[in-house]
Structures are given as structure tokens and as C-alpha cells.
Amino acid sequence: VLSGTGLPTSVFSRPRYLILLATLCCLLWGSAYPAIKGGYALLGIARSDTAAQLVFAGWRFLLAGALLLVMAQLTGRRVWALAPVQWAQLGLLGLAQTALQYVFFYVGLANTTGVKGSILNATGTFFSVLLAHFLYANDRLSRRKALGCAVGFAGVMVVNLRGGTQGLDAGFTLLGEGFIVIAAFVLSAASIYGKRLSQRIDPMVMTGWQLGIGGLVLLLGGLAGGGDIRGWSAGSLALLGYMAVLSAVAFTLWAALLKHNRVGQVTVFNFLIPVFGALLSALFLGEAVLEWRNLAALVMVCGGIWLVTTEAQAPRPVSSST
């Protein structure tokens, strides 16, 4: 039986492959940090130019969605033969998981510090665990899971306090810190909604449409807001292409992992993203990678993941059917 990614379903439900594939997804998403910074530098996009950032993100996700849909079509998947209700569901998923989430995130990031933005964005894992607790009987919140999330979140804080507490204060504004938290919640809720849709729609097709629809909305919204990107070069196009590919691969694998595993066991790996982002950014910027903060954060995040993923599985009920 195939999972919708071309890989056997059993691959995604085995613990060792869950760890490997979820870590790969987070490594790819973490690599987007230096790639985005590099793209902004090559295209002259200012940190405060939210409209241009939305245009850049729109192209990234639109291309990622197109790549997935072409691949799905070539491998014989049902790309167009969907019921009207499924089109509506995919539209809602694309608007929420890609478009709405990124609008909140980019606007929020423009109105707060990078340190606070990264830390608050990590609250998405808590939202996912809490939502799963109320939606799935086999994914209840436990002391071990809560401890694992707390340890992982502490690791995210450690990797972000590179300059001491600079950029970290008690200030809170709706357009800044508030929007970052809203973005994290929207992404968590949309991911769980996507988990439900993936039971009836091929994960590759689902991811392709949600990225494509969301990317188109971001692109049009950015252009309507005055976003203007000029001076495309071979380097900036290569970076855009890389980000489109990483998005296509990571989001498809993530959707398949969520389909075949409990939410908490997958989303706890999200704590790795800012750690990988910091490590890869330091590597490409020529900074010291083997800082104690980076190593301590990696150990803490891995410890949190271990606590959650090694939690005793609830026994499956024996089917009464013959």
C-alpha cells in the first residue's frame, strides 16, 4: 500500500522512519532561514517591506504547488477528479495553512524582534498538542508529553538568546507578538485539518493544491499591497527554486507523517526548526557553529523529542469484525 508519496505506508508508521523523515523535514525548513535571508539580500528586499516579502513567498509556494501537482499527474494520481466539497476543503486549507498563516507571521515579524518572533512561533507545537488532546482519544496530553514539550521549548529559547536577553522583553503588541502567536495557532489548526483531509485525499495532491492556492493568494496580496521585486538574477532564481523544492518535499512528507501517526509525536519535531535554522545560518554566515548555546539547544530539543516519541503507545482496540 502506498502512502500518497510513493513510499509504502509502513515507512511512515515505523518509529525509526518517523524520526528520520520528521528530522529531514525540519532540516529542510531550517535551511529556509539562510535561504530567505540570502534571497532578500540578492533582491534588495528590506526587512520592513512586508508586501515584497509576501510576493517572494507567493512565488515560492506557487512554484512548490505546481511542482507537486505536475509530479502527481505524471504518477497517475487524481489531481483534478475531486468532489466539489473537496475543492472547497482544499481552498480553505490553502488559505489557512499557507496564506493566512504567512500574512500573520510576516506582519508580526516586522513588528517585533527576531528573537521574540522565533520563540513565540515555537508555541505552535503546544497548540498542536492541546488541539490533538481534545480531538483524538489516542493523543491525550500526559505528564511525559508536557515535559517533553517544555524541554523542547526551553531549547528554542536557549538557541535564540545568542546575545543574552537583547531583543527579549515583556512588551506585547497585537500587530507584533500577537500576530506571531496567531500565526502559530493557525498553522497548528490547519495542520490538524490537513490530517483529516489526507484520509480521503492523496497527501501529494492535497499538499500541491494547498501550497498552490495559498501561494497564489500571497502573490496577489503582495502585488496589491505594492510589493515589487526586480533585479532577478541566476543566484536569486536558484534560491527561489531551492525553496520551492524544499517546500514541496517537506510539506508532502509532513502531511504523510501526520496522516499515519499521532499529532503530538510528529509536531514535537518542530522544535528542531529554529535550532537547524540557527546552525545553518551561522554556517553560511561564517559564524561559530559549535557554540555552547547551539549544542545545548540541540541536546534539549532532542531530549524533548525523545520524551514525546518514546511515550508508551495506547493499546489498539481489537476489532470485533471477522
Feature roles, as predicted:
Residues 2-58, 95, 169-196, 220, ...:
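Glycine-/small-residue-enriched transmembrane alpha-helix faces in small-molecule transporters
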Residues 32, 73-121, 158, 243-261:
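Specific transmembrane alpha-helical segments of multi-pass solute transporters/efflux pumps
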Residues 35-48, 110, 160-173, 222-239, ...:
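Membrane-interface helix termini and inter-helical loops of multi-pass transporters
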Residues 39, 56, 108, 113, ...:
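Hydrophobic/aromatic residues within transmembrane alpha-helices
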Residues 42-100, 127-131, 151, 186-190, ...:
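Transmembrane alpha-helices of multi-pass small-molecule transport proteins
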Residues 52-64, 109-125, 173-185, 233-247, ...:
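Structural signature of hydrophobic alpha-helical transmembrane segments
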Residues 59, 98, 102-103, 116-123, ...:
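Helix-helix packing/entry segments at the starts of transmembrane helices
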Residues 68, 130-131, 143-163, 271, ...:
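Hydrophobic transmembrane alpha-helices of multi-pass small-molecule transport proteins
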